[in-house]
Amino acid sequence: VTPTEEISYAEMLENIRLFARYTPEQKEAKTIVFAENSVEWIYSFFSIWQNKGIAIPVDASSTVDDVAYILNDARPEAIWVSGQTEETARQAIEKAGVDTVVLRMDDLSGLAAHDETKETGISFEDSDVCVILYTSGTTGFPKGVMLTFKNLLVNIDAISSKEVPIFNKNSSTLILLPLHHVMPLVGTLVAPIFSESQVVLCPT
């Protein structure tokens, strides 16, 4: 649910498949998601998993230097951007001297209704690295923390099991915080989606 529309799971999957047509397809390909919270952010993120890639969420308020550092460290194949972050991303790519491809999520918004790709789900091995989160810690430059699907599934099970049924098909979760942080990413997006519950996207 967004301030302007309600999106079904079928519509979400259709949009993810559309975005996946532009996301790098090779297994373990790294792709940055550099944008403010939006439904396009969600489609971009899950399209990376659709193609068995590794997602790297980055703070939408990051500076050119911040993004250039992550680009140089992670060497991603592509970076999803919004209209607000595109210029910063392009300057960072030039500064880092990498060949990362810029993908504009705004260009795909509203096109999914015409997508005719075959319906396929997201498949993975528990040991596959699925996301790299850059965290600054207390000193020095941010460190890229690699998480596997098993890491996420353990957390999801802990809050969605019969013993602790925080998320279920009848629950609704409000996404308030930026999704590049692990807590909102897992706790307000991935876990509710895996539990087939409703998420409500707060405008940022």
Name what the model sees in each region.
Residues 153-172, 179-204:
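Conserved AMP-binding/adenylation subdomain of ANL enzymes
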Residues 84-126:
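ANL superfamily adenylate-forming
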Residues 15-18, 35-36, 56-71, 83-85, ...:
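ATP-dependent adenylate-forming carboxylate-activation enzymes
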Residues 21, 60-91, 155-174:
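Conserved ATP-dependent adenylate/AMP-binding module captured primarily in the ANL superfamily
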Residues 1-25, 32-38, 42-46, 63-68, ...:
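Conserved AMP-binding/adenylate-forming core of the ANL superfamily
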Residues 8-11, 130-157:
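Conserved AMP-binding A3 loop
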Residues 45-51, 57, 73, 181, ...:
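Short hydrophobic alpha-helices that are characteristic scaffold elements of the AMP-binding
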Residues 116-134, 141, 166-172:
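Conserved pre-ATP/AMP-binding loop-to-beta segment of ANL
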